[in-house]
Swiss-Prot record:
PANTHER family: THREONINE--TRNA LIGASE, CHLOROPLASTIC_MITOCHONDRIAL 2 (PTHR11451:SF44), THREONINE-TRNA LIGASE (PTHR11451)
Gene: thrS
Cofactor remark: Binds 1 zinc ion per subunit.
Organism from which the protein derives: Francisella tularensis subsp. holarctica (strain OSU18)
Name this protein carries in UniProt: Threonine--tRNA ligase
Subunit architecture: Homodimer.
Cofactor: Zn(2+)
GO cellular component, one term: cytoplasm
NCBIfam families: thrS
Main localization, broad class: cytoplasm
Length: 634
């Protein structure tokens, strides 16, 4: 007999060789039905794995994040199974879990399009209903290679060749087998709420020199209700797509001459200026001096900073006069150069620097997505150089600034995470203990709840991540606060302490909105293009009922502009209904409509974008009304 301890501290006896599914059944049939896998002594295992010794057991169900991930990973296998049934000559490659779903890459011998997805999905449902048990076997590497070679799965052979392990796991359901680390669901019957969503191209291993594969995306949920809710969200997200709204509002465009880099139009630049000016004022409030550093630097700087070894493949490089240069992928090393121009005393610290720095990263073309994933973007970077004793207070201030910014931009629902030490890291455990505690203390001081994520910190220090939830419930990773033990040492960022000794400065990195391009894309989707008054590219559209009011329209327009209102004058010889509809589609917050009565009484009639009639008032009163909203960030 063996003893199994449960999360509530209770201990029960079972026969040796029992599995997690059996344990779940002994508690309740409904629990067994919901069980996807289990943690056995902190190791995630398949639900059918035998337990032969005393252990701690935590069952994983579809309600757990790990359970949902296993469900989705198994659904990716079901997709591959269905594709092989329908297109036997297809080669399968990889099928990982992604946010809210999964994908699988295939090498089809025939042409496949979006129209084929319903057929594949139908086959998936047929296979799931067969309730095929899912099992695995562990085989030597050589046997796994021979197995997949015999099936003509050359990509699987290549994957196995690249893995250092000598033992491979092969999962099987019905007549389909796939290479995988697992774990997987016990039976295909639990896959009931899934849908294939789109199809795209993807190069094998992300290398454009390799074959272009067909990537099929899908989503999978614990219940049909969850699936329906998610699909409704996708439908709403489609309406909010910043690329479509950006075109309607004439904000920006992309073209093949400069892939992944936006061309900003007048209206887009107006939004950009509001975001940048707001952040500049916020930085001033929190004592950050603004700097501007070179876009290009000698490659040796990136070698010293460590970026060359980490980002070389994603860096744009050039040569000039027999010297190697690179366009910066990050702003940090050039900021350190500004710090290093002076000898600093501990009395000078903290020194806070902010930069709206343009960076370039050679992202794969297939990953580019409007403003949300680009090759050139402007980062609202901040770098603080301080003593170890000052770190906690500086992080407290950064957290305060982040929350102020997000609330002003209309994000009131967010999650905060602390990414803790990874296995491979620099620095001793004592330094990491202290650093991680500082981040926790700073969040506690701001009454912020947070989650801990062991192993997800950078090798050079732990970090805080801010995840914002938008109007339709999507989560966006936005700001970061990062402790850095590495770069100050590498680049010689030092100060003289009170004993006259040279010490390495502590360096804090922070980005609040992050990429301005991405943040503006987020804002557009969050507000569905109906930006709050203070951010709207055009705040008021002025129009007359007939051309007889043209002179008065011009007079009102000039008065609005003199009061700092971003106004548009519409003197076209069109019906007033047409003008109202057009400016409503352009998401202009307020429409000023002028007729004979308004002209004679020197007043204006105001209509909100929503269609609400605000009645009549003087231009001065309207400007005061607008200014109050703008100041309140409404």
């Amino acid at each position: 007999m063996i003893n199994i301890r449960f999360p509530d501290g209770s201990i029960r006896e079972f026969e040796a060789g029992v599995n997690s599914l059996d344990v779940a059944k002994s508690i309740s049939p409904s629990l067994a039905k919901a069980t996807m896998a289990a943690y056995i002594d902190d190791q995630l295992k398949d639900a059918k794995d035998a337990i032969n010794s005393n252990c701690e057991l935590r069952l994983i169900t579809v309600k757990d994040p790990e359970g949902l991930e296993i469900l989705r990973h198994s659904c990716a296998h079901l997709l591959a199974h269905a594709v092989k049934e329908l297109y036997p000559n297809t080669e399968v490659t990889i099928g990982p879990v992604v946010d809210n779903g999964f994908y699988y890459d295939f090498s089809f011998k025939e042409s496949i399009g979006e129209a084929d997805l319903p057929t594949i999905e139908k086959k998936m449902k047929e296979l799931a209903k067969k309730s095929a048990p899912v099992s695995y076997r562990v085989v030597p590497k050589t046997e796994a290679i021979e197995f997949f070679k015999a099936q003509g799965e050359n990509y699987k052979v290549e994957i196995i060749d690249s893995i250092a392990d000598e033992q491979m796991k092969i999962y099987t359901q019905d007549n389909f087998s796939d290479l995988c680390r697992g774990p997987h669901i016990p039976n295909t019957s639990v896959l009931k709420a899934f849908k294939l969503t789109k199809l795209a191209g993807a190069y094998w291993r992300g290398n454009s020199d390799n074959e272009m594969l067909t990537r099929i995306y899908g989503t999978c949920w614990a219940t049909k209700e969850d699936l329906e809710q998610y699909l409704n969200m996708l439908e709403e997200a489609e309406k909010r797509d910043h690329r479509k709204i950006g075109k309607v509002l004439d904000l920006f465009h992309f073209q093949e001459d400069s892939p992944g880099i936006a061309f900003w139009h007048d209206n887009g630049v107006r939004i950009w200026r509001q975001v940048e000016d707001y952040m500049r004022a916020s930085n001033n409030k929190y004592g950050c001096s603004e700097i501007r550093t070179p876009l290009i630097a000698d490659f040796s700087l990136w070698q010293k900073s460590g970026h060359a070894s980490k980002y070389a493949e994603n860096m744009f490089a050039t040569k000039s006069e027999n010297r190697d240069f690179a366009i910066r992928p990050m702003n940090c090393p050039t900021c350190v150069q500004v710090y290093n121009t002076k000898l600093h005393s501990y009395r000078d610290l903290p020194i806070r620097m902010a930069e709206f720095g343009i960076v370039h990263r050679n992202e794969p073309s297939g990953s580019l997505h409007g403003l949300l994933r680009v090759r050139s973007f402007t980062q609202d970077d901040g770098h603080i150089f301080c003593t170890p004793e000052q770190v906690e207070e500086e992080v407290i201030l950064m957290v305060q600034q982040c929350f102020e910014v997000y609330k002003d931009f209309g994000f009131n629902d967010f999650a905060v995470k602390i990414a803790l030490r990874p296995e491979n890291r620099i620095g001793d455990d004592e330094t990491w203990d202290k650093s991680e505690q500082i981040l926790k203390n700073a969040l506690d001081a701001n009454n912020v709840s947070y989650e801990l994520f062991p192993g997800e910190g950078a090798f050079y220090g732990p970090k805080i991540e801010f995840h914002l939830k938008d109007a339709i419930g999507r989560s966006w990773q936005c700001g970061t606060i990062q402790l850095d033990f590495s770069m100050p040492q590498r680049l010689g960022a030092t100060y003289i302490d009170k004993n006259g000794e040279k010490q390495v400065s502590v360096m804090l990195h922070r980005a609040i909105v992050g990429s301005l391009e991405r943040f503006i894309g987020m804002l557009i989707e969050h507000y569905a293009g109906n930006l709050p008054l203070w951010l709207a590219p055009v705040q008021v559209a002025v129009m007359g009922i007939s051309n007889n009011q043209d002179d008065y329209c011009k007079e009102v327009f000039i008065m609005l502009e003199k009061n700092g209102i971003r106004a548009k004058l519409d003197l076209r010889n069109e019906k007033i209904g047409f003008k109202i509809r057009e400016h409503t589609l352009l998401r202009v917050p307020y429409l000023v409509i002028l007729g004979k009565n308004e002209q004679e009484q020197k007043i204006i009639t105001i209509r909100k974008h929503s269609g609400e009639d605000l009645g009549q008032m003087s231009v001065d009163d309207f400007c005061a009304f607008l200014d109050k909203q703008i100041q309140a960030k409404e």
